[in-house]
Amino acid sequence: MPDLDLSPDALLSSGSRLPAVTEWLTRAVWSQDRFATLPREDYLRSGEAAVARAEELISVGASRAWDELAAETTRAPTPRAFLGLDREPATARAPARAVVVFDGLSLRELPLILALAAQTGFRVDESRVIATSLPTETLDFVSQRVLGPDAARGIGPNQLPSVGALTARGVQAVYLDSLTPRISLTAGKSLLLWSTYPDRLFKNDQARFDTQLFPQFCEYVATLWKYTIQAVPPGVPIVITSDHGYIFFGGTAESARESAAADQLGQQRSCVFEDAAPYPAPHPDLQRFPAQHRAMLRGRLKTRPKGTASRRLYQHGGFSLMEVLVPWVLLNRN
C-alpha cells in the first residue's frame, strides 16, 4: 500500500495550509481508488490512522492550520443560500432546488456518494470539501446553516417540516428516520430532505467494532439513495452535504499524548462556559472562541466522559479534520 502520510512540507507553507490538507484527504486518504480496491475495514482503519498522524503533526508543529480551519467555517456554502432562503422579500421564491442532508456523513463516505451518482445516471457538477458549522453538532447546523435568522433556539431536524419560514418560501422539508420512508414530494417546490443516517448507526453505544458500522452504512446507502436522491423530481439540482463528520477512535486512530485540555472541557469535545466561570487560557489542544465563551478540543485527543458515551468509537462535537470537514456535492440528472 502506498504511503498515506501527509507530507510535512504541506504544513510549512507560508500561505494557507488547508488546501493541501483537503486535497490530501480526498485524493490520497479517502480516494475513489482506495475505496474501490480495499476491504471496507482496511479502508477505514488505514485511512483514519493516517488522518490521526496528520492531526498530530498539526497539533505539535503547525497549529495555525487549526485557525485556518476555524476561519473556513465562515466562508462555506450553506443549504440556506443554495435554497434561496436569503432572498428578499421573505415571500420570494427561488427556482426549485433540493438539499439532501445525510446526518453525520463524513469525507470517508465521499467516494461512495460519487460512485452511486455515476451508477444511477447523475452528473457530478461539483464535488468539494467544506467546513461545517461550529460546534460540530446537529442543532447548531440547523440554526446556522439552514434556518439562519429564522431560527428559534433548539430546533431539531425532526421539526423542520413544521417551520413556517420554510413553507412560506416554497420549501418542503422532510425528515427521514428510516431506510425506506414513505414520502410524497411536491413537484415545483424546493426540497430539504434530512436523513438520520449514518448518524443513527454511528452513535450506537453497543457497536464496539470498527468492522461493524462503516461497512454496514455502505450497504445501507444504496437503499437510502433510492428514497432520497432518486426520489427528487427530474430537472431539480441536488446538493448532498452533512451537518458534521465523525471522528473514529478505533485501533491507532487516537492520540497517545497526555494533555490537560480535555479536563478543562469536563471531558467533553466542546464546552460553553458560563459568564462567571473561568475561561480556559490558550492551550495548544484547545480551539478557543472567547466571544461565544466556547472552547473545543482539537484533533485526536479522546475524551473520557462518564457513562456509555466513553465507549463510542465514533464521536463528533469537537474540532478535528474529520468532524469539521464534510462533503458538498452538486448533482444533476444526465
Question: Where in the sequence are the language-model features?
Answer:
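Feature captures the catalytic ectodomains and active-site-proximal regions of enzymes
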Residues: 1-334
